[in-house]
């Protein structure tokens, strides 16, 4: 793991969290219990404070940053998809930010909301609970359904379990030169399926 103190502030990581060795945490970063931080994530707490609350995840290639005297927060069970950028914003409890989305300064994503992949949420947006946000700039399309929220929660549970699995089952290795016969497949811990299979 790449942890850096910045002007006396040292990142704080709960012992039950998993931070991939290629992720970078700088300065004023606080990571809660059961959090998963994926490969190549960058958390630059060199201006504002960055907080990932318990059970949340920040996947591969995500960026968190913010201005001085601001907090960038992912609340409990928040789910941040691959490549998303969070800058000086707040993501509510149990909300999902889709892959490659950008959430700008002062924006608030309401609890149990979903931001669709590739969306751009403008600075200062003030969301409410259970909104489905889509587009660039993002607009409220409708309310999140119970089925969508269930799907989101299953995915978040997978990442909470992945944090545990990675702490015990991930190790650096050298590759094989060819696939072994009857190579096993990995399994998740829930019955979650991609949306295309629903």
Swiss-Prot record:
Recorded metabolic or biological pathway in which this protein acts: Amine and polyamine metabolism; carnitine metabolism
Ranges of compositional bias, category Basic and acidic residues: 180-198
UniProt-recorded Gene Ontology molecular function terms: transferase activity
SUPFAM superfamilies linked: Trimeric LpxA-like enzymes (SSF51161)
Region (Disordered): 174-198
Any matching Pfam family: Hexapep
Keyword Cell inner membrane: no
Keywords, sorted A to Z: Repeat, Transferase
Family: Belongs to the transferase hexapeptide repeat family.
Protein purpose: Overproduction of CaiE stimulates the activity of CaiB and CaiD.
Family annotation (NCBIfam families): PRK13627.1
The protein's name in its UniProt record: Carnitine operon protein CaiE
Annotated source species: Salmonella dublin (strain CT_02021853)
